[in-house]
Design a protein with these regions (language model features):
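Membrane-interface interhelical linkers
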Residues: 1-12, 19, 29, 35, ...
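A generic hydrophobic-segment detector
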Residues: 1, 106-107
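Hydrophobic core positions of alpha-helical segments in small-molecule transporters
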Residues: 40, 102-103
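Hydrophobic/aromatic residues within the transmembrane alpha-helices of Major Facilitator Superfamily
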Residues: 15-19, 47, 78, 105-106
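Structural motif at transmembrane-helix junctions in multi-pass transporters
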Residues: 30-33, 86-102
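Short, solvent-exposed interaction modules
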Residues: 76-87
Length: 107
């Protein structure tokens, strides 16, 4: 039996990824700095995730479990920040379609 929820979530992620790039590019046009735009994007995302975390069981107990995580486990945010910033820098120069086509090629 197929589990449709992960399939739908993956499709939603595929739709949201270029949408996020276009939205962040628009924000960059207003703030004038792609790094600031990336920072704002991560702050807003962190707030949204924090709200979601409040609805999980024992959200603050989960933080205690991170004490034994290896250093490499903490670097995912760096990868995300580099990805978002690269996307913001690329979209105005080569467009959304080309940017994400090349991002997929890089995978």
């Amino acid at each position: 039996m197929t589990n449709w929820l992960p399939i739908l979530l993956a499709i939603l992620a595929g739709v949201l990824t270029p949408t996020q790039g276009a939205i962040n590019n628009k924000l960059t046009q207003f703030v004038g700095n792609p790094i600031l735009s990336s920072f704002i994007s991560f702050i807003v995302g962190s707030i949204a995730l924090g709200i979601c975390l409040l609805f999980t069981k024992n959200p603050f107990a989960l933080f205690y479990q991170t004490k034994d995580a290896p250093l490499i486990a903490w670097t995912g945010g760096i990868c995300g920040a580099l990805f978002i910033t690269a996307i913001i820098l690329a979209i105005p120069r080569i467009g959304v379609t080309m940017t994400f086509s090349l991002a997929i090629l890089g995978q």
